[in-house]
Swiss-Prot record:
This is Aspartate carbamoyltransferase catalytic subunit. NCBIfam families: asp_carb_tr, PRK00856.1. PROSITE patterns: CARBAMOYLTRANSFERASE. Belongs to the aspartate/ornithine carbamoyltransferase superfamily. ATCase family. Pathway: Pyrimidine metabolism; UMP biosynthesis via de novo pathway; (S)-dihydroorotate from bicarbonate: step 2/3. It comes from Ignicoccus hospitalis (strain KIN4/I / DSM 18386 / JCM 14125).
Amino acid sequence: MPDVVDVLDLDKKDMIKIFELAEDIEYKKLHKSKWCALENKTVSLLFVEPSTRTRLSFEESAKRLCAHTLTIVGEEASSFVKGESLYDTIKVLDKISDIIVIRHNLDGSAKYASEVAANPVINAGDGKNQHPTQSLIDLYVVRKRKGGLEDLRYAVVGDLRYARTARSFLLALTKFKPRSVYLVAPEVLKPSIKFLEELKSMGLNVFEVDRLEDVIPNVDVIYVTRIQKERFPDPSEYEKVKGSYKITLDLIKRGKGDLIVLHPLPRVDELDVRIDSTPHAAYFDQVAASVPVRMATLAWSAGVV
């Protein structure tokens, strides 16, 4: 049964299968039909790093599939405070559950967990590295709003150095051949040259631009991230860049009529709240999609579909 640790663990066919399954789940919910795909299964949720939306949506997803859930939140709530290693924690959870969902502040922690565990591991965010289920949610919403994922123009805006959501989103896009992807970030938040080269080597038509204003008339999708304050090694560096960009309603009005704006949330001050009431806002669609997409991912990883 497959892990979902890196978005590149999934090929295009896998992603489309998850999207189609999520659509079926939404249809079932609309018609009050229950799907107990994980009945008599146990899903362990190890959330060492703080989380609200991701943890709650995984809990709800597992419960809607009729699974039992075991939730460990924060280092203080686990045996880590007693000195237990991540290795031992994963070993224990692997013996009493069928799937492990892990969120951790260390890059590569989910990959490590998958090497320790015999059962499937799903990465709910590991440091600044990746957040694969969020990228599935993001692409699911784009697909739903745009009727497909191919041949679109994207702008990815904000913290492109530390935001794992942006990193996973860009890697996921490599599967769908967008027409172009514009990266817009303050100098200190630009992606590394190594990551840019990786994206280009996978065929992504990616361009760094200084101003969103210069490309917004041609863009179909804008993906915005907050500045990841908690990931800065030096707090004074965060102070220099906080508030350095904002997507305003006036700026959005300069784009296409069917332009959509995504944001993985939470937001701080980088996204104008006036956009919320316009057809451009797709970020609350992302919240709504989080449960069906994560239900589909859990079922796929468990091998029941």
